Every structure is written in structure tokens, then in C-alpha cells.
Amino acid sequence: MYFQIAIDGPSSSGKSSVAKTVARQLGFEYFSTGKMYRAFAYVMQVNRLDVNLLLKVINQINWRFEHEKVFYNNADISEVILNQEIAQLASNLATNPEVRKMAVLRQQALAKNTNIVMDGRDIGTVVLKDAQLKYFLDAKPEIRAQRRAQDLGIAYDSDKAFQELVAEIKHRDAVDTSRTADPLVQAPDAIYIDSSNLTFQQVVELMVQQARTVFKL
């Protein structure tokens, strides 16, 4: 039997960093579904494709996802796809039902025959519906804005600038929870964690301990 851990949550909730660390401590594979949408966005951008063309050529594209890396035509694009322009395009793509359907099939294939920790916005509800452990990792928008600013190395010199970031996060939440294709929602059997007052390490330790208990590791 293979073990699956699904971690969902809104943007900047820390789910990718937590999921990656949990996977390493358990010796599991790790995959962030956000990387797949970013890879789609990157391919669209460099080849000047629209969504319809992307859907037509998707099976002909030479890319692979392995060991937390993303490769396109054998080139590592893991860092390139982190830029804000790609992120915005990926966010728009993720609202397209056909793109999501295509992505989910690939994500499910990646999770076969391996122990895995996967994070995203529809893992516990769509991608890995039968995962033995599911989490919904959340935090207050203001806390998530602070964490994103730290991750990006941005020091806000005014409250107005910071509030704009908070507003951006709230807007992203609204988009994610209201889209027609696989909206962001907590799975009924997911464990809810509000990390607003928890450290990164506390969240990781909680998940690792529960996984070792449930999976008898």
C-alpha cells in the first residue's frame, strides 16, 4: 500500500514549503500542483500559444516533473516559472475547466505507485480524493501577506503598500473559491489548521507526527 497526504489551502498559506519539508522528513515524494500550471503558462508564453493551442499540443510537449524540479525540453525551468508574470498567467489558466481536467489526469498519474505529499487547491477534493491524510492549511490574510513579503524579500515602506498586498491576497481567495472548475474548498475529511499563530516548524511537526501515527511509520 502507498500513502498519500493531500495539503490544500489558499495562496501564501505556506502549504508548499510545509508539504516539501513533511515529504523530506517522511521520505516521501513531493509535488506541488501549482508548478504544473506554471509550466503550462511558461510553455504558452515562450511559444506564444493561446489556451486552445495549448490543449491541442499538450501531449507533444517535452517536459517532465521530477525531484521537485520542472524540465522543459530537458532544461530546468524550476526557477524561471516563479516570476510574477508566469504566476498571474498560471492563475488565469487554473480557472479553465479543460486545462484543469488535463492537469488533474497528469497529477494523478504522478501520484501512482509511490508515497507522496501533494499540495494545491483541489488535492483532497479532486486530485487525491482517497488520500489517507488530508489537510487544509490556512492563515489570516494579513499573516499571509507578511509571509509573502518575507519570501519575496520585500520591505514595505508604507501601510498603503502592505494593504494593497492584503487586498491582492483576498482577491485571489475570492477567485479561487468562486471558480466553477474545482473551486478551493476544504474536503469534509480534511484536518483544518490555522497557522496564524503557529511557527513553520510547529505545523510540520504536527503533520509528521500524525502521518507516523496513521501510517504506522
Swiss-Prot record:
Gene3D superfamilies: P-loop containing nucleotide triphosphate hydrolases. Its EC number is 2.7.4.25. Coiled coil: none annotated. ATP binds at residues 9-17. One of its GO terms (molecular function) is dCMP kinase activity. GO terms for cellular component: cytosol. It is found in: Cytoplasm. One of its GO terms (biological process) is pyrimidine nucleotide metabolic process. CDD domains: CMPK. Its main location: cytoplasm. Belongs to the cytidylate kinase family. Type 1 subfamily. PANTHER family: CYTIDYLATE KINASE, CYTIDYLATE KINASE/PANTOATE-BETA-ALANINE LIGASE. This is Cytidylate kinase. It comes from Mycoplasma pneumoniae (strain ATCC 29342 / M129 / Subtype 1). The gene is cmk.
